[in-house]
């Protein structure tokens, strides 16, 4: 079974994608830097998890799986 992301990671990622839709791409490294700039997350692990979920959301939007 896979790991389930915590609710606050999903919530923060969704808020970032909705608030700054043109800031994020499908590139994880770029998204990681943007998450660092736009949030006050101090933990590297949490920042990377948020950036990973942002990347997934952007990819899903491009494929038309979410609105």
Swiss-Prot record:
<comment type="subunit">
    <text>Part of the 30S ribosomal subunit.</text>
</comment>
<dbReference type="InterPro" id="IPR036401">
    <property type="entry name" value="Ribosomal_eS17_sf"/>
</dbReference>
<dbReference type="InterPro" id="IPR018273">
    <property type="entry name" value="Ribosomal_eS17_CS"/>
</dbReference>
<protein>
    <recommendedName>
        <fullName>Small ribosomal subunit protein eS17</fullName>
    </recommendedName>
</protein>
<dbReference type="Pfam" id="PF00833">
    <property type="entry name" value="Ribosomal_S17e"/>
</dbReference>
<dbReference type="GO" id="GO:0003735">
    <property type="term" value="F:structural constituent of ribosome"/>
</dbReference>
<keyword id="KW-0687">Ribonucleoprotein</keyword>
<keyword id="KW-0689">Ribosomal protein</keyword>
<comment type="similarity">
    <text>Belongs to the eukaryotic ribosomal protein eS17 family.</text>
</comment>
<dbReference type="GO" id="GO:0006412">
    <property type="term" value="P:translation"/>
</dbReference>
<dbReference type="GO" id="GO:1990904">
    <property type="term" value="C:ribonucleoprotein complex"/>
</dbReference>
<dbReference type="GO" id="GO:0005840">
    <property type="term" value="C:ribosome"/>
</dbReference>
<dbReference type="InterPro" id="IPR001210">
    <property type="entry name" value="Ribosomal_eS17"/>
</dbReference>
<dbReference type="GO" id="GO:0005829">
    <property type="term" value="C:cytosol"/>
</dbReference>
